[in-house]
Amino acid sequence: MSLSSLEHKLTYHVRNWLHGSGFAWNTLHMSAFLVALCACIPAGFISQISLYSEPWREHLGYSVVEVNVLFSAVNLGGYITPPLLGLLSDAHGPVMLSWLSFVGFVPTYAYAAWVFASGEPHFYASVLCFTLIGISTNALYFSALFTASKLYPASKLCSISLPATFYGMASVLGSQLLKIPWFRNGLPYLDLSRVFRTLAVAYTLISFCMWFATSIVTMLKVKAATLTFAGMQSPTEPLLPQDIRRRLRNFFHDPAAYFMALVLLLSLGPMEMFLTNMGSLSSLLGQASVLPEFAIASTCSRFLSGLIIDLCIHNGVSTMSVQWAVLLLGVVGQWIVVLATRASDGPLLSLASALSGACYGGLFTVSPILTLAVWGDAVFGTAYGSFMITPAVGSILFGLTYAHIFDANCTPSGVLPVCIQHVFWSSTSALAIALLFSVLMYLVFWRRKV
């Protein structure tokens, strides 16, 4: 497949420099993969957004509803745009997404730092900024994910599981980094002006490194195109445009795709709500932040899910069993939150956070692997990107439900944690329905496919 004019221009100088650098191709190949994996970590730093809740409320005077609107703006930007990002990557290569992430991250975080330092709310401008940050988060992660999948298309561990695992590591590393006293600047909460300025600098450096990594993918594409022209087409080469259009048409007309979308809406929606509101929930129960438990379980689940799926494939076991297992963990985790609010039991919340984190991380590994297995790599970016629209809707619905119930029932001093239990009965029910639809999807459509 020939390069687009834009991809050619964006990578031209880097490719020329790399060609003249004398580095062995294997060295460039491995270096690009390692850079892509490392880029997945800062791509996941937005998972720390629940730690911004207290500074926003205390320093800028945002209400819980306004904080949840900012959370929803991130989710909206992150989940609505993946189909477009997938199409842009297919047309112009992952380098296009890495540049989009740079343009989206650096100015917005610089502005958000200024807003916090000024002490003025600037709420609507902040909503726009965090919508762009949500878009940029997915652009950087997709750029890294597609780079890894192009470099190692035959390995699910390298192409999907490891990028997802490194993305999940952001929660663990980020929460530890933000414990450094410098980020508090003597305040009882995070000084977000320092946090956001640091992120602006970090994303500048990461974008520069990804420019080189994605240019190596372009070199691989040029190499494959040269083999095609010579009549030695590789079986891993991209399909012809008409074949891609046919597969896209088949995907959008496949009823199973809509079952899959519903499963993700009813599972990732509640998980996003729990993740973004665990700060206020922990305060309600008098418990320290349970984000580390969620983050560690999520990271471990991302890696283990990939390994278990490889074992399932090797032993002829349906990979759907892994999705059922992680959904069941989510059901149990959210039900334990209900028990924790009834008993005002903080340690129970830690267990619920770990189980919910395992569900969350597992879904982000299992879902792309199932998408790749059923609809193929030719339309993987567009297909998986399309699925990411549905959790946006779910996260907004469940997040705003949490905010309204919290503001209505849980703001007076001395209120009991049971005031919020109805939200988690809803999330438990939603995950149980998602599990039911996942089983039906397998029995009706995928019995012989996965």
UniProtKB/Swiss-Prot annotation:
It is a multi-pass membrane protein. The keyword Membrane applies. Its main location: membrane. The keyword Transmembrane helix applies. Keywords: Membrane, Transmembrane, Transmembrane helix, Transport, Vacuole. It comes from the Eukaryota. The chain crosses the membrane at residues 32-52, 69-89, 96-116, 127-147, 157-177, 199-219, 255-275, 290-309, 320-340, 355-375, 378-398, 423-443. It is found in: Vacuole membrane. One of its GO terms (cellular component) is fungal-type vacuole membrane. Probable transporter. Belongs to the major facilitator superfamily. This is Probable transporter MCH1. The lineage of its organism: Eukaryota, Fungi, Dikarya, Ascomycota, Saccharomycotina. The gene is MCH1.
